[in-house]
UniProtKB/Swiss-Prot annotation:
It is a peptidoglycan-anchor. One of its GO terms (cellular component) is Gram-positive-bacterium-type cell wall. Substrate binds at residues 163-165, 175, 221, 270-272, 283, 325, 330, 674-675, 750, 816, 846, 849, 856, 903, 976, 996-998. This is Pullulanase A. Ca(2+) 1 binds at S668, Y670, D999. Pfam families: Alpha-amylase, CBM_48, Gram_pos_anchor, PUD, SpuA_C, YSIRK_signal. Residues 42-139, 1147-1255 are annotated as: Disordered. Residues 1-44 form the signal peptide. It catalyses: Hydrolysis of (1->6)-alpha-D-glucosidic linkages in pullulan, amylopectin and glycogen, and in the alpha- and beta-limit dextrins of amylopectin and glycogen. It comes from the Bacteria. Keywords: Calcium, Cell wall, Glycosidase, Hydrolase, Metal-binding, Peptidoglycan-anchor, Secreted, Signal, Virulence. Virulence factor. Involved in the degradation of glycogen of the mammalian host cells. Hydrolyzes the alpha-1,6-branchpoints of glycogen. Hydrolyzes pullulan. Does not hydrolyze dextran. Binds to mouse lung alveolar type II cells that are rich in glycogen stores.
């Protein structure tokens, strides 16, 4: 194997010209070698761009797609050249949402002048190979739009493409390979460019991104609006910001001046401000407009560093006196930060930032928001005056009659104007104009809420033993609504159509029975859709309140309107499934801090072929899941969180029985479920018979019942933040169900619509469906996907409604700060910042995740458990449910986790971070030791712990397809994969690991039951599994790790490893802290994530811990004391832990252990709770050695025991009230030590105290090294001078 040299391993070659000079040369050379050795090594990690997929993912293919990726169809995975386009299934990103599209200016009317070409910027040299290179641009064909790119994100342009959507002729489809390839790009002096065909003259918005064949969104979503019809190109700068002109080199602004008369004689510019060379000649001798460019004449002005603004005057030097000023007023431009060109025209007073002379204050849309108000959005309203807005505005009704504007209100920050008047006609639109901008109003959701909000019953209610169905649909803008009924045995066969009658407040109603002449006596199992006619257009829509569906196949969606969305089924859920189903009585659970949540995917849990012979029900189903529940009961978790089980879009349910045994990471009939189609109906993917709409209901009820029988609860993962397709709700009622842009168009996310939960009927949908799921299925909680996309009020209302039904219910969600809402209508979001205002719903803590194992945006970089030093106080704060990136006023606000379904598994991220190939026995063991450290820290943290399925045994999503055992070409890389390398740059054996497996096969996604349960075949995995089981038992055996309030935590939890004391650095890989349980028992947690043994000095304050029993060591954990613990030893100063070892100690209130101690066994023989496979290892399996990482390195000794806690820590401890006698004595010891230190400053800030800390050796070694270098260099120089004199 070739070893990649680091920066300090460069080979130095010297020529010794003569024997006399040899000694001097060698000495100087040696000094240089030593100098290089003294230089810190800089390692270069492989770049891992953020994966942000585009908004559009399922439209029409472009003519020149990217070269196909390696991800196969599942039919011939070993053929790496076989085509395999990605399934258009949706992706959600836990770490961070897709970049919002650029918000462009409004469409103008005036084209830019075309007075010549200009290419004055410096040419860009690309390292990418050039297929077609032209220095001058080719003309742009009619109905095409040219996109210029300064530089491509990656070197291999053939593996990158332009993914397009919105107003293009053929939006891209088949992510990621359907993009327009840069292989076909041309090149000019600016960079590369591609031409995209538009869908016609009506095209206004072009959205795009640059991706690669590995499925990475390299630029984030971008968009450009055509400011005028003739606008046909845009530029991306080096940071991929979009401009309507060619960006200039940094430090320069170009002033373009266009005169319609073509006369530039003696026209000049006088300028000042943040410019390098302000005009200083004799007035009025300005800088002449002599250079000719694309937009008239121009002057390039060098700017000062960090320039913000400059002022200028346009001059006509042929005139005299004050007439020399073309305009008497000074011009001032204040946005040099964002623009490198400005555009002037004749004597126009405006400074334009586009070459089409479109005014900055432009109307961009209009909405009818109330019976007395119309709201218009504007590009900007900075400097706008009320009288000017009134003067230039006009509103007419649908008959063309002018409507009096009685008042205007300007919202400069929100960029909107509200017109007051009599706008009581809610059936017809109004026309609003401002200067040359004119818009027809869209009916705002606010007007619909005011006029049509409805609180009655919705959906289909099956009654009278199936003989009658009561239908109610809300669609106030519909002109006509009918129900289309399909045959129960053939969902494609129409039985008949019945018109609905218009009801109150926008509803449509009908009762189906024997009088409807459909020939149906029992409607149970029949299917239906709503046919809605609106303004001459007819659509078929899915009932949003449907209780079940026909079998769904998204591959058929393009057949016709009847197949683009599912068909609802008439069912009565109350009569299905176990009749004794009730709310769960969960063991070891009273409050949310007691929960131990286990996240699982229904299909993954039973798709392992190794258990096929053991299952009596079809794999991947609700029924099969029941057969493996005892494993989770044995593990000890309180709640099972199921990835989405409600109907999702991109899947073929009719093929759910087909096992995806070949390795593939795209084009799989598999889905996580984050592309919702309906919020009441279950998917058929996990049913034993997807064709039977009642089966899925009965089987899911039975699963919940069996979970409850085992003393566990069920949490549903729900996805209200976006839908699979925007039309699912737009067809029901346009411009209502989603959050809206300022012009009234729906906002999208991940290809679907962002559900606008601030709108009354959308909030009803969310709250009603949550209530239905609790009432019908008796579930015990909800996890909200991208909860930060929602307003806090809606989530709070849903929580209260659900808790009214099930008082033990818990809610949690992703609280990332992603709220978009309705444009310019901010409100309180249900994100992490909300936690200080509520104690109802919890959020995931990315702070503990990122600090313990790394995460966005630095996933894969060393963190606490992977060798990366972290701030000890930050780690401690996270462990006591006080993350540093948001305020939690209750420990239950915080979900403590280091792994979830998103991104790499914990095992894989550890391997990536420490750069060690798990195929090597010693590396495999080390990864597991680090994994156990992470699991211990999460399970002993305050708050609510969360476990990803398989995290307990070291689940991996390594891509073990033989065709990918070594790296492949960029255009063959598996979709959603990371290529992992060791510290020398060598790829791992099977180097590809799937980080987001939502479209991968069962081979990638399966829960590996052999690794989880077979201690002979996989001892290291089963040891980790048993370790997790023991940690859960330990957590549940005491309240110490489940404190209920911040005050309790402040009183009972104390940091032992204070930074700056006893050898603990500010940033370190060790931590120790103590907890006093409410019953007086004292617990201590010590973690050594260092690669060498570390000693923890207990001093006198924590000397009582010497009498503790050990509950966790390097091999096992539990609530029972370990007789002969491994990996730790008591020393004179305290406790020493081996490398990569943690321990939990307990000092019981009565001074004795709670139970008889357990004997530590040499090989920690694990339990076999479920499945025991005694067979030999499969040929491709991972090794499972018992080897340990090298722990023979010198111990890191601490300073003497006289080093005391810092004053701040001591004071905080001394002030805390005593709860029990032992706790009081501990605090008294701390107080006494703090008194001795009372006159001293914090150790970390005092030079004298720093001298007491142990030397690491680095400082002294460097001094000696540089002294040696200097001596060698001087000796060498002396030899050379001496030789020179002799010569």
């Amino acid at each position: 194997m070739r070893k990649t040299p680091s920066h300090t391993e460069k080979k130095m070659v010297y020529s010794i010209r003569s024997l006399k000079n040899g000694t001097g040369s060698v000495l100087i050379g040696a000094s240089l070698v030593l100098l290089a050795m003294a230089t810190p090594t800089i390692s270069s990690d492989e770049s891992t761009p953020t994966t942000n997929e585009p908004n559009n993912r399922n439209t029409t293919t472009l003519a020149q797609p990217l070269t196909d990726t390696a991800a196969g169809s599942g039919k011939n995975e070993s053929d790496i050249s076989s085509p395999g386009n990605a399934n258009a299934s949706l992706e959600k990103t836990e770490e961070k949402p897709a970049t919002e599209p650029t918000t462009p200016a409004a469409s103008p009317a005036d084209p830019a002048p075309q007075t010549g070409q200009d290419r004055s910027s410096e040419p860009t040299t690309s390292t990418s190979p050039v297929t077609t290179e032209t220095k001058a641009e080719e003309p742009i064909e009619d109905n095409y739009f040219r996109i210029h790119v300064k530089k491509l994100p990656e070197e291999n342009k053939d593996a990158q493409g332009l993914w397009t959507w919105d107003d293009v002729e053929k939006p891209s489809e088949n992510w990621p390979n359907g993009a327009l390839s840069f292989k076909d790009a041309k090149k000019d002096d600016y960079g590369y460019y591609l031409d995209v065909k538009l869908k016609g003259e009506q095209a206004k918005k072009i959205s795009f991104l640059i991706n690669n064949t590995a499925g990475k969104n390299l630029t984030g979503d971008k968009s450009v609006e055509k400011l005028v019809p003739k606008m046909n190109e845009a530029w991306l700068d080096q940071d991929y910001k979009v401009f309507s002109y060619e960006p200039q080199p940094a430090g320069t602004v170009r002033v373009n001046y266009y005169r319609t008369d073509g006369n530039y004689d003696k026209k000049s510019l006088w300028y000042w401000g943040d410019v390098k060379n302000p005009s200083s000649a004799q007035w009025p001798d300005g800088t002449d407009f002599t250079a000719t460019g694309k937009y008239g004449r121009y002057i390039d002005i060098p700017l000062n560093e960090a320039a913000r603004e400059f002022g200028f005057l346009l001059l006509d030097e042929s005139k005299q006196g004050d007439d020399v000023k073309i305009r008497k007023e000074n011009y001032k431009f204040t946005d040099l930060k964002n623009h490198s060109q400005i555009f002037l025209k004749d004597d126009d007073e405006s400074i334009y930032t586009n070459p089409y002379y479109v005014h900055d204050i432009r109307m961009t849309g209009a909405q009818h928001v109330g019976t007395s108000s119309i709201e218009s959005s504007f590009s900007t309203l900075v400097g706008a005056k009320k009288e000017d807005i009134l003067k230039h505005s006009n509103i007419t009704n649908h008959l063309g009659n002018k409507v009096t504007i009685t008042d205007v209100a300007i919202d400069e920050a929100g960029k909107k104007v509200t017109y007051s008047g009599d706008f009581s006609d809610t059936k017809h639109p109004y026309t609003v104009s401002y200067n040359s901008d004119q818009f027809t109003t869209k009916t705002s959701w606010r007007l619909k809420d005011e006029t049509y909000s409805y609180d009655g019953k919705l959906g289909a209610d099956l009654k009278e033993e199936g003989k009658q169905v009561d239908l109610t649909l809300w669609s106030p803008s519909a002109d006509k609504v009918s129900v289309v009924v399909y045959d129960k045995n053939d969902p494609d066969k129409v039985v008949g159509t019945v018109a609905l009658e218009k009801g109150e407040r926008g509803t449509w109603k009908q009762t189906l029975d024997s009088t409807n002449k459909l020939g149906i006596t029992d409607f149970t199992g029949y299917y239906y859709q709503y046919q809605i006619e609106r303004q001459g257009k007819t659509v078929l829509a899915l009932d949003p309140y449907a209780k079940s569906l026909a079998a769904w196949n998204s591959d058929d969606a393009k057949i016709d309107d009847a197949h683009k969305v599912a068909k609802a089924a008439f069912v009565d859920p109350a009569k299905l499934g176990p009749q004794d189903l009730t709310y769960g009585k969960i063991h070891n659970f009273k409050t949310r801090e007691d929960a131990v949540i286990y996240e699982a995917h229904v299909r993954d849990f039973t798709s392992d072929p190794a258990i096929a012979k053991d299952l009596t029900k079809p794999f991947g189903t609700f029924e099969a899941f029941i057969e493996k529940l005892d494993y989770l009961k044995d593990l000890g978790v309180t709640h099972i969180q199921l990835l989405p089980v409600l109907s999702y879009y991109f899947v073929n349910e009719l093929k759910n029985h087909e096992h995806l045994s070949d390795y593939a990471s795209s084009n799989s009939n598999y889905n996580w479920g984050y592309d919702p189609q309906n919020y009441f109906s279950l998917t058929g993917m996990y049913s034993s018979d997807p064709k039977n709409p009642e089966k899925r209901i009965a089987e899911f009820k039975n699963l919940i019942n069996e979970i409850h029988k085992r003393g566990m609860g069920a949490i549903l993962d729900v996805v209200y933040n976006h839908t699979a397709k925007v039309d699912i709700f737009e067809d029901l009622e346009p411009n209502y169900y989603h959050f809206m842009d300022a012009d009234g168009t729906p906002r999208t996310s991940f290809g679907g619509g962002r559900l606008g939960t601030t709108h009354h009927m959308t909030k009803r949908l969310l709250v009603d469906s949550i209530k239905y799921l609790v009432d019908t299925y008796k579930v015990d909680g909800f996890r909200f996907d991208m909860m930060g996309d929602h307003d806090a009020a809606s989530i709070e209302e849903a929580y209260k409604a659900a808790r009214a039904l099930n008082p033990n219910l818990i809610m949690l969600g992703e609280g990332w700060r992603t709220y978009a809402g309705d444009e310019n209508m901010p409100t309180k979001a249900a994100d992490q910042d909300w936690m200080k205002h509520t104690d109802t719903v919890a959020v995931f803590s990315d702070d503990i995740r990122n600090n313990l194992k790394s995460g966005y945006p630095n996933e894969g970089q060393p963190a606490f458990i992977t060798g990366g030093k972290r701030d000890v106080n930050t780690i401690f704060k996270n462990l006591i449910a006080q993350p540093t990136n948001f305020e939690a006023d209750s420990p239950g606000d915080v979900i403590q986790y280091i792994a979830a379904h998103d991104n790499l598994t914990l095992f894989d991220i550890i391997a990536q971070s420490i750069k060690k190939d798990p195929s090597k026995a010693e590396n495999y063991a080390e990864i597991h030791r680090r994994l156990r450290l992470g699991n211990l820290m999460v399970l002993t943290a305050q708050g609510t712990p969360f476990i990803h399925s398989g995290q307990e045994y070291g689940r991996t999503k390594q891509f073990r397809n033989p065709a990918y055992r070594t790296p492949v070409a960029e255009d063959k890389v598996p979709n959603k994969s990371h290529l992992l390398r060791d510290k020398d740059g060598n790829p791992f054996d099977y180097p590809y690991f799937i980080h987001d497996s939502y479209d991968s096969s069962d081979a990638v996604n399966k829960f590996d039951w052999t690794k989880a349960t077979d201690g002979k075949a996989y001892p290291e995995n089963v040891k980790s599994r048993d370790y997790m089981k023991g940690l859960i038992a330990l957590r549940q055996s005491t309240d110490a790790f489940r404190l209920k309030s911040l005050q309790d935590i402040k009183d009972r939890v104390h940091l032992i490893t204070v930074p700056g004391q006893n050898g603990v650095e500010k940033e370190d890989v060790v931590i120790g802290y103590q907890i006093t349980a409410p019953n007086g028992d004292i617990y201590a947690v010590f973690v050594n994530a260092d690669e060498k043994a570390r000693e923890f000095n207990l001093g006198t304050a924590f000397a009582h811990l010497r009498n503790a029993e050990v509950l966790a060591d390097e091999n096992q954990a539990g609530s029972v004391g370990i007789a002969n613990p491994k990996g730790l030893e008591w020393t004179e100063k305290g406790l020493k832990l081996n490398a990569l070892t943690a321990t939990v100690l307990r000092v019981s209130q009565n001074g004795t252990s709670h139970e008889s101690t357990a004997e530590e066994k040499p090989d920690s023989t694990p339990s076999k709770p479920e499945h025991q496979n005694e067979a030999s290892h499969p040929a491709h399996q991972d090794p499972a050695p018992e080897a340990r990482p090298d722990s023979t390195k010198p111990d890191a000794k601490v300073a003497d025991a006289e080093n005391k806690p810092s004053q701040a820590t001591a004071d905080s401890q001394a002030e805390q009230p005593a709860q029990e006698a032992q706790a009081s004595s501990v605090k008294e010891a701390v107080r006494k030590e703090s008194v001795e230190n009372s006159s001293k400053e914090n150790i970390s800030a005092t030079p004298d105290r720093q001298a007491e800390l142990p030397n690491t050796g680095i400082k002294n070694e460097n001094k000696l090294l540089f002294a040696g270098i200097s001596l060698l260099a001087l000796l060498g120089l002396g030899f050379l001078l001496k030789n020179k004199k002799e010569n």
